[in-house]
Amino acid sequence: MKKYNRIFTIVIDSLGIGEMSDSKEYGDVNVDTLRHISESVDEFKIPNLQKLGLANLHPIKHVEAVEKPLAHFMKMREASVGKDTMTGHWEMMGLKIETPFQTFTDTGFPQELLDELEKRTGHKIVGNKSASGTEILDELGEHQIKTGDMIVYTSADSVLQICGHEETFGLDELYRCCEIARELTLKDEWKVGRVIARPYLGMKKGEFKRTSNRHDYALKPYGATALNALKDNGFASISVGKINDIFDGEGITESNKSKSSVHGMEQTLEIMDKEFKGSCFVNLVDFDALWGHRRNPVGYAEELEKFDVNLGKVLDKLKEDDLLIITADHGNDPTYKGTDHTREHVPFLAYSPSMTESGLMETSDSFAAIGATIAENFGVKMPENTIGESVLSKLV
Protein backbone atom coordinates (compact mmCIF):
# COMPACT_ATOMS: atom_id res chain seq x y z
CA MET A 1 0.00 0.00 0.00
CA LYS A 2 1.15 3.51 -0.73
CA LYS A 3 2.55 5.31 2.28
CA TYR A 4 1.50 8.71 0.94
CA ASN A 5 -1.35 9.41 -1.48
CA ARG A 6 0.08 12.73 -2.68
CA ILE A 7 3.66 13.98 -2.80
CA PHE A 8 4.27 17.71 -3.34
CA THR A 9 7.84 18.57 -4.40
CA ILE A 10 8.58 22.30 -4.36
CA VAL A 11 11.79 23.51 -6.02
CA ILE A 12 12.99 26.88 -4.71
CA ASP A 13 14.93 27.54 -7.90
CA SER A 14 18.62 28.22 -7.13
CA LEU A 15 18.53 27.98 -3.30
CA GLY A 16 21.95 26.36 -2.87
CA ILE A 17 23.38 25.64 0.58
CA GLY A 18 27.14 25.74 0.18
CA GLU A 19 29.86 24.65 -2.19
CA MET A 20 30.58 21.06 -3.18
CA SER A 21 34.02 19.47 -3.26
CA ASP A 22 34.27 20.08 -7.02
CA SER A 23 32.77 23.60 -7.09
CA LYS A 24 36.17 25.15 -7.82
CA GLU A 25 36.26 23.24 -11.12
CA TYR A 26 33.18 25.26 -12.10
CA GLY A 27 34.73 28.58 -11.07
CA ASP A 28 32.81 28.72 -7.79
CA VAL A 29 34.80 29.39 -4.60
CA ASN A 30 33.21 29.90 -1.15
CA VAL A 31 29.74 30.13 -2.67
CA ASP A 32 26.72 29.75 -0.38
CA THR A 33 23.45 31.14 -1.72
CA LEU A 34 21.33 30.78 1.42
CA ARG A 35 23.89 31.90 3.99
CA HIS A 36 25.08 34.87 1.95
CA ILE A 37 21.49 36.03 1.38
CA SER A 38 20.88 35.96 5.14
CA GLU A 39 24.07 37.93 5.77
CA SER A 40 22.96 40.66 3.34
CA VAL A 41 19.91 41.78 5.33
CA ASP A 42 19.34 43.22 8.82
CA GLU A 43 16.58 40.74 9.60
CA PHE A 44 15.37 37.57 7.95
CA LYS A 45 12.09 35.96 8.97
CA ILE A 46 11.31 32.51 7.57
CA PRO A 47 9.49 30.88 10.52
CA ASN A 48 8.00 28.00 8.55
CA LEU A 49 11.26 26.96 6.90
CA GLN A 50 12.81 27.42 10.35
CA LYS A 51 10.40 25.07 12.09
CA LEU A 52 10.88 22.46 9.36
CA GLY A 53 14.59 22.52 10.22
CA LEU A 54 16.33 24.51 7.47
CA ALA A 55 18.59 26.28 9.99
CA ASN A 56 19.38 22.92 11.60
CA LEU A 57 20.60 21.72 8.21
CA HIS A 58 22.61 24.81 7.30
CA PRO A 59 23.70 28.00 9.13
CA ILE A 60 21.46 31.00 8.41
CA LYS A 61 22.10 34.42 9.92
CA HIS A 62 19.14 35.75 11.96
CA VAL A 63 17.53 32.26 11.96
CA GLU A 64 18.17 29.92 14.89
CA ALA A 65 18.12 26.15 14.71
CA VAL A 66 15.08 24.69 16.49
CA GLU A 67 15.15 22.05 19.21
CA LYS A 68 12.51 19.84 17.59
CA PRO A 69 12.38 20.35 13.81
CA LEU A 70 9.32 19.00 12.02
CA ALA A 71 11.06 17.60 8.94
CA HIS A 72 13.59 14.97 8.01
CA PHE A 73 16.36 16.79 6.18
CA MET A 74 19.67 16.27 4.39
CA LYS A 75 22.04 17.87 1.93
CA MET A 76 22.17 16.54 -1.60
CA ARG A 77 25.22 16.52 -3.87
CA GLU A 78 24.86 16.83 -7.62
CA ALA A 79 26.11 13.68 -9.35
CA SER A 80 25.80 15.12 -12.86
CA VAL A 81 28.23 17.47 -14.51
CA GLY A 82 26.82 20.98 -14.72
CA LYS A 83 24.93 23.48 -12.63
CA ASP A 84 21.94 24.37 -14.78
CA THR A 85 18.18 24.01 -14.49
CA MET A 86 17.71 21.02 -16.78
CA THR A 87 20.59 19.07 -15.29
CA GLY A 88 19.30 19.62 -11.75
CA HIS A 89 15.68 18.73 -12.48
CA TRP A 90 16.45 15.77 -14.72
CA GLU A 91 18.73 14.40 -12.01
CA MET A 92 15.99 14.78 -9.38
CA MET A 93 13.89 12.41 -11.46
CA GLY A 94 16.70 9.91 -12.03
CA LEU A 95 18.79 10.99 -15.03
CA LYS A 96 22.51 11.56 -14.56
CA ILE A 97 24.07 13.94 -17.08
CA GLU A 98 27.58 12.67 -17.94
CA THR A 99 28.35 15.12 -20.75
CA PRO A 100 27.62 18.78 -20.07
CA PHE A 101 25.19 20.59 -22.33
CA GLN A 102 27.03 22.70 -24.91
CA THR A 103 27.40 26.39 -24.13
CA PHE A 104 28.25 29.39 -26.32
CA THR A 105 29.03 31.77 -23.48
CA ASP A 106 32.45 32.93 -24.64
CA THR A 107 32.08 32.66 -28.41
CA GLY A 108 28.47 33.49 -29.22
CA PHE A 109 26.62 31.31 -31.71
CA PRO A 110 28.31 30.20 -34.97
CA GLN A 111 27.72 32.44 -37.98
CA GLU A 112 26.31 29.50 -39.96
CA LEU A 113 23.54 29.06 -37.37
CA LEU A 114 22.78 32.79 -37.34
CA ASP A 115 22.64 32.90 -41.15
CA GLU A 116 20.19 29.99 -41.23
CA LEU A 117 18.07 31.52 -38.48
CA GLU A 118 17.92 34.87 -40.29
CA LYS A 119 16.97 33.14 -43.54
CA ARG A 120 14.24 31.00 -41.94
CA THR A 121 12.71 33.73 -39.76
CA GLY A 122 13.12 36.73 -42.06
CA HIS A 123 14.64 38.82 -39.27
CA LYS A 124 18.13 40.25 -38.99
CA ILE A 125 19.85 39.14 -35.77
CA VAL A 126 21.49 41.47 -33.26
CA GLY A 127 23.19 40.67 -29.96
CA ASN A 128 24.75 37.20 -30.19
CA LYS A 129 26.61 37.32 -26.90
CA SER A 130 26.27 36.29 -23.29
CA ALA A 131 24.35 38.85 -21.25
CA SER A 132 21.72 39.24 -18.57
CA GLY A 133 18.18 39.91 -19.74
CA THR A 134 18.21 43.41 -18.26
CA GLU A 135 21.49 44.33 -19.96
CA ILE A 136 20.51 43.08 -23.40
CA LEU A 137 17.16 44.90 -23.33
CA ASP A 138 18.76 48.16 -22.21
CA GLU A 139 21.26 47.82 -25.04
CA LEU A 140 19.02 46.63 -27.87
CA GLY A 141 15.34 47.01 -26.89
CA GLU A 142 14.91 50.42 -28.52
CA HIS A 143 16.75 49.16 -31.60
CA GLN A 144 14.34 46.23 -31.94
CA ILE A 145 11.29 48.48 -31.64
CA LYS A 146 12.62 50.68 -34.47
CA THR A 147 13.91 47.94 -36.80
CA GLY A 148 12.13 44.65 -36.05
CA ASP A 149 15.51 42.96 -35.71
CA MET A 150 15.62 39.85 -33.54
CA ILE A 151 17.62 39.94 -30.29
CA VAL A 152 19.48 36.66 -29.79
CA TYR A 153 21.68 36.09 -26.76
CA THR A 154 22.92 33.39 -24.39
CA SER A 155 24.19 32.96 -20.84
CA ALA A 156 26.45 30.58 -18.95
CA ASP A 157 23.71 27.97 -19.41
CA SER A 158 23.14 25.92 -22.55
CA VAL A 159 20.50 28.28 -23.92
CA LEU A 160 19.62 30.28 -27.01
CA GLN A 161 17.36 33.13 -25.92
CA ILE A 162 15.30 35.35 -28.20
CA CYS A 163 13.78 38.63 -27.00
CA GLY A 164 10.66 39.98 -28.64
CA HIS A 165 8.63 43.06 -27.76
CA GLU A 166 5.07 41.82 -27.21
CA GLU A 167 3.47 44.72 -29.09
CA THR A 168 5.93 45.64 -31.84
CA PHE A 169 7.54 42.25 -32.56
CA GLY A 170 4.50 40.24 -31.46
CA LEU A 171 4.18 37.25 -29.16
CA ASP A 172 3.10 34.81 -31.88
CA GLU A 173 6.00 35.92 -34.07
CA LEU A 174 8.42 35.44 -31.17
CA TYR A 175 7.14 31.92 -30.58
CA ARG A 176 7.37 31.14 -34.31
CA CYS A 177 11.01 32.26 -34.39
CA CYS A 178 11.80 30.21 -31.28
CA GLU A 179 10.27 27.08 -32.81
CA ILE A 180 12.53 27.53 -35.83
CA ALA A 181 15.53 28.07 -33.54
CA ARG A 182 14.66 24.91 -31.61
CA GLU A 183 14.51 22.90 -34.82
CA LEU A 184 17.90 24.24 -35.96
CA THR A 185 19.58 23.67 -32.60
CA LEU A 186 18.77 19.97 -32.58
CA LYS A 187 21.82 19.52 -34.83
CA ASP A 188 24.73 18.16 -32.78
CA GLU A 189 27.10 21.03 -33.60
CA TRP A 190 24.52 23.65 -32.58
CA LYS A 191 22.66 21.70 -29.88
CA VAL A 192 21.55 23.63 -26.80
CA GLY A 193 19.52 22.46 -23.82
CA ARG A 194 16.83 25.10 -24.20
CA VAL A 195 15.59 27.77 -26.57
CA ILE A 196 13.82 30.43 -24.50
CA ALA A 197 11.29 33.00 -25.71
CA ARG A 198 11.83 36.20 -23.69
CA PRO A 199 8.92 38.59 -24.31
CA TYR A 200 9.03 42.09 -22.85
CA LEU A 201 7.17 45.40 -22.70
CA GLY A 202 8.23 49.05 -22.33
CA MET A 203 9.34 51.63 -24.86
CA LYS A 204 12.71 52.91 -23.70
CA LYS A 205 15.92 52.00 -21.92
CA GLY A 206 15.49 51.59 -18.18
CA GLU A 207 11.76 50.87 -18.53
CA PHE A 208 11.83 47.50 -20.28
CA LYS A 209 10.30 44.64 -18.29
CA ARG A 210 10.12 40.96 -19.20
CA THR A 211 6.60 39.53 -19.07
CA SER A 212 5.29 36.21 -17.77
CA ASN A 213 4.73 34.90 -21.32
CA ARG A 214 8.16 33.29 -21.42
CA HIS A 215 8.23 29.87 -23.04
CA ASP A 216 11.00 27.27 -22.89
CA TYR A 217 11.62 24.86 -25.75
CA ALA A 218 13.68 22.16 -24.07
CA LEU A 219 15.31 19.02 -25.35
CA LYS A 220 13.38 15.91 -24.46
CA PRO A 221 15.04 14.00 -21.61
CA TYR A 222 17.41 11.40 -23.07
CA GLY A 223 15.60 8.63 -21.16
CA ALA A 224 12.49 7.92 -19.13
CA THR A 225 12.29 9.39 -15.62
CA ALA A 226 10.31 8.88 -12.42
CA LEU A 227 7.65 11.12 -13.98
CA ASN A 228 7.17 8.67 -16.86
CA ALA A 229 6.95 5.80 -14.36
CA LEU A 230 4.15 7.60 -12.53
CA LYS A 231 2.19 8.56 -15.64
CA ASP A 232 2.58 5.14 -17.27
CA ASN A 233 1.18 3.47 -14.16
CA GLY A 234 -1.90 5.65 -13.93
CA PHE A 235 -0.79 8.10 -11.24
CA ALA A 236 -1.15 11.86 -11.47
CA SER A 237 2.00 13.74 -12.46
CA ILE A 238 1.03 17.39 -12.10
CA SER A 239 3.45 20.21 -12.92
CA VAL A 240 3.47 23.84 -11.77
CA GLY A 241 5.70 26.56 -13.24
CA LYS A 242 8.36 25.64 -15.77
CA ILE A 243 8.48 21.91 -14.90
CA ASN A 244 6.50 21.00 -18.02
CA ASP A 245 8.93 22.96 -20.21
CA ILE A 246 12.01 21.45 -18.52
CA PHE A 247 10.81 17.92 -19.33
CA ASP A 248 9.24 18.94 -22.66
CA GLY A 249 5.96 17.52 -21.38
CA GLU A 250 7.40 14.02 -20.88
CA GLY A 251 5.74 12.22 -17.97
CA ILE A 252 3.33 15.09 -17.22
CA THR A 253 -0.43 14.51 -16.88
CA GLU A 254 -1.45 18.11 -16.09
CA SER A 255 0.49 21.34 -16.62
CA ASN A 256 -0.03 24.67 -14.82
CA LYS A 257 1.95 27.67 -16.05
CA SER A 258 2.84 30.30 -13.43
CA LYS A 259 3.11 34.07 -13.81
CA SER A 260 5.40 34.36 -10.77
CA SER A 261 6.66 32.36 -7.81
CA VAL A 262 3.86 33.74 -5.63
CA HIS A 263 1.36 32.65 -8.30
CA GLY A 264 3.02 29.21 -8.38
CA MET A 265 2.39 28.81 -4.66
CA GLU A 266 -1.22 29.97 -5.10
CA GLN A 267 -1.66 27.33 -7.82
CA THR A 268 -0.16 24.70 -5.52
CA LEU A 269 -2.61 25.62 -2.78
CA GLU A 270 -5.49 25.22 -5.26
CA ILE A 271 -4.18 21.83 -6.37
CA MET A 272 -4.06 20.75 -2.72
CA ASP A 273 -7.86 21.12 -2.64
CA LYS A 274 -8.19 18.46 -5.37
CA GLU A 275 -8.37 14.71 -4.83
CA PHE A 276 -5.64 12.82 -6.69
CA LYS A 277 -3.06 10.10 -6.21
CA GLY A 278 0.42 10.90 -7.37
CA SER A 279 2.90 13.75 -7.61
CA CYS A 280 2.71 17.53 -7.85
CA PHE A 281 6.08 18.93 -8.97
CA VAL A 282 6.49 22.71 -8.54
CA ASN A 283 9.21 25.08 -9.76
CA LEU A 284 9.41 28.62 -8.39
CA VAL A 285 11.67 30.44 -10.84
CA ASP A 286 11.69 34.04 -9.58
CA PHE A 287 14.37 33.35 -6.96
CA ASP A 288 16.77 32.52 -9.78
CA ALA A 289 15.56 34.76 -12.59
CA LEU A 290 14.80 37.96 -10.69
CA TRP A 291 17.29 37.87 -7.81
CA GLY A 292 20.06 35.31 -8.29
CA HIS A 293 21.13 36.21 -11.83
CA ARG A 294 20.64 39.90 -11.11
CA ARG A 295 22.84 39.61 -8.02
CA ASN A 296 20.23 41.08 -5.69
CA PRO A 297 20.52 39.35 -2.29
CA VAL A 298 18.02 41.69 -0.61
CA GLY A 299 15.35 40.95 -3.24
CA TYR A 300 16.11 37.23 -2.86
CA ALA A 301 15.64 37.45 0.92
CA GLU A 302 12.33 39.27 0.52
CA GLU A 303 11.12 36.66 -2.00
CA LEU A 304 11.99 33.90 0.49
CA GLU A 305 10.02 35.67 3.20
CA LYS A 306 7.00 35.87 0.85
CA PHE A 307 7.41 32.19 0.03
CA ASP A 308 7.54 31.33 3.72
CA VAL A 309 4.13 32.94 4.30
CA ASN A 310 2.59 30.76 1.58
CA LEU A 311 4.53 27.76 2.87
CA GLY A 312 2.63 28.19 6.14
CA LYS A 313 -0.63 27.86 4.19
CA VAL A 314 0.69 24.70 2.49
CA LEU A 315 1.62 23.19 5.86
CA ASP A 316 -1.87 23.92 7.17
CA LYS A 317 -3.46 22.13 4.19
CA LEU A 318 -1.31 18.99 4.28
CA LYS A 319 -3.26 15.82 5.04
CA GLU A 320 -1.96 12.90 7.10
CA ASP A 321 -1.23 10.95 3.92
CA ASP A 322 0.47 13.87 2.10
CA LEU A 323 4.24 14.33 1.87
CA LEU A 324 5.91 17.69 1.23
CA ILE A 325 9.47 17.85 -0.16
CA ILE A 326 11.30 21.18 -0.44
CA THR A 327 14.50 21.34 -2.47
CA ALA A 328 16.49 23.31 -5.09
CA ASP A 329 18.06 22.56 -8.46
CA HIS A 330 21.42 24.39 -8.13
CA GLY A 331 22.82 27.51 -6.47
CA ASN A 332 22.89 31.12 -7.66
CA ASP A 333 24.75 33.08 -4.99
CA PRO A 334 23.64 36.71 -5.49
CA THR A 335 26.76 37.96 -3.69
CA TYR A 336 29.16 36.15 -6.05
CA LYS A 337 30.93 37.60 -9.09
CA GLY A 338 29.32 37.44 -12.52
CA THR A 339 25.71 36.49 -13.22
CA ASP A 340 25.90 32.70 -13.44
CA HIS A 341 24.56 29.82 -11.36
CA THR A 342 26.86 28.42 -8.67
CA ARG A 343 27.54 24.72 -8.12
CA GLU A 344 26.34 23.93 -4.61
CA HIS A 345 24.69 21.36 -2.40
CA VAL A 346 20.92 21.69 -2.27
CA PRO A 347 18.53 21.10 0.64
CA PHE A 348 16.09 18.23 1.01
CA LEU A 349 13.36 18.82 3.59
CA ALA A 350 10.60 16.20 3.87
CA TYR A 351 7.55 16.58 6.09
CA SER A 352 4.18 14.93 6.62
CA PRO A 353 1.73 15.54 9.48
CA SER A 354 1.82 11.77 10.07
CA MET A 355 5.55 11.72 10.88
CA THR A 356 6.57 10.89 14.44
CA GLU A 357 10.32 11.43 13.99
CA SER A 358 12.51 14.07 12.35
CA GLY A 359 16.08 15.23 12.00
CA LEU A 360 19.28 15.03 9.98
CA MET A 361 19.89 12.26 7.46
CA GLU A 362 23.13 11.36 5.71
CA THR A 363 24.07 13.49 2.68
CA SER A 364 22.67 12.06 -0.55
CA ASP A 365 25.10 11.31 -3.37
CA SER A 366 22.63 12.69 -5.91
CA PHE A 367 19.49 14.76 -6.32
CA ALA A 368 17.84 11.56 -7.57
CA ALA A 369 16.88 10.55 -4.03
CA ILE A 370 13.72 12.55 -4.76
CA GLY A 371 12.56 10.58 -7.80
CA ALA A 372 13.55 7.26 -6.24
CA THR A 373 11.58 8.08 -3.08
CA ILE A 374 8.49 9.09 -5.06
CA ALA A 375 8.71 5.93 -7.22
CA GLU A 376 9.07 3.62 -4.22
CA ASN A 377 6.16 5.29 -2.46
CA PHE A 378 3.80 4.59 -5.35
CA GLY A 379 5.21 1.13 -6.00
CA VAL A 380 6.44 1.90 -9.50
CA LYS A 381 9.75 0.74 -10.91
CA MET A 382 12.27 3.41 -11.83
CA PRO A 383 13.10 3.25 -15.56
CA GLU A 384 16.32 1.63 -16.76
CA ASN A 385 19.54 3.65 -16.64
CA THR A 386 18.32 5.89 -13.83
CA ILE A 387 20.10 6.63 -10.57
CA GLY A 388 18.94 7.39 -7.05
CA GLU A 389 18.52 5.81 -3.62
CA SER A 390 15.11 6.14 -2.00
CA VAL A 391 14.89 7.50 1.56
CA LEU A 392 11.23 6.53 1.97
CA SER A 393 11.97 4.09 4.81
CA LYS A 394 13.59 6.91 6.81
CA LEU A 395 10.59 9.22 6.54
CA VAL A 396 8.80 7.98 9.65
From Swiss-Prot:
Signal sequence segment: none
Where Mn(2+) 2 binds, per the record, is at D288, H293, H341
Which GO CC annotations does the UniProt entry carry?
cytosol
Indicate where this protein resides in the cell.
Answer: Cytoplasm
Q: How is the cofactor bound?
A: Binds 2 manganese ions.
Cofactor(s) for this protein? Mn(2+)
Q: Which Gene3D superfamilies would you find in this protein's record?
A: Alkaline Phosphatase, subunit A, Phosphopentomutase
Which GO terms of type biological process are on file?
2-deoxyribose 1-phosphate catabolic process; 5-phosphoribose 1-diphosphate biosynthetic process; metabolic compound salvage; nucleotide metabolic process
**Looking at the keywords, is Transmembrane present?**
no
- Enumerate the UniProt keywords alphabetically: Cytoplasm, Isomerase, Manganese, Metal-binding
Q: Specify which residues bind Mn(2+) 1 according to the UniProt entry for this protein.
A: D13, D329, H330
Q: Which GO terms describe its molecular function?
A: magnesium ion binding; manganese ion binding; phosphopentomutase activity
A Pfam family of this chain: Metalloenzyme
**Where does it mainly reside?**
cytoplasm
The protein's superkingdom reads Bacteria
Record's catalysed reaction(s): 2-deoxy-alpha-D-ribose 1-phosphate = 2-deoxy-D-ribose 5-phosphate; alpha-D-ribose 1-phosphate = D-ribose 5-phosphate
Enzyme type, top EC level: isomerase
Q: In which pathway does it act?
A: Carbohydrate degradation; 2-deoxy-D-ribose 1-phosphate degradation; D-glyceraldehyde 3-phosphate and acetaldehyde from 2-deoxy-alpha-D-ribose 1-phosphate: step 1/2
InterPro entries (alphabetical): Alkaline_phosphatase_core_sf (IPR017850), DeoB (IPR010045), Metalloenzyme (IPR006124), Phosphopentomutase_DeoB_cap_sf (IPR024052)
EC assignment: 5.4.2.7
Q: Which PANTHER family match?
A: PHOSPHOPENTOMUTASE
Protein's job: Isomerase that catalyzes the conversion of deoxy-ribose 1-phosphate (dRib-1-P) and ribose 1-phosphate (Rib-1-P) to deoxy-ribose 5-phosphate (dRib-5-P) and ribose 5-phosphate (Rib-5-P), respectively.
Provide the family line: Belongs to the phosphopentomutase family.
Annotated protein name in UniProt = Phosphopentomutase
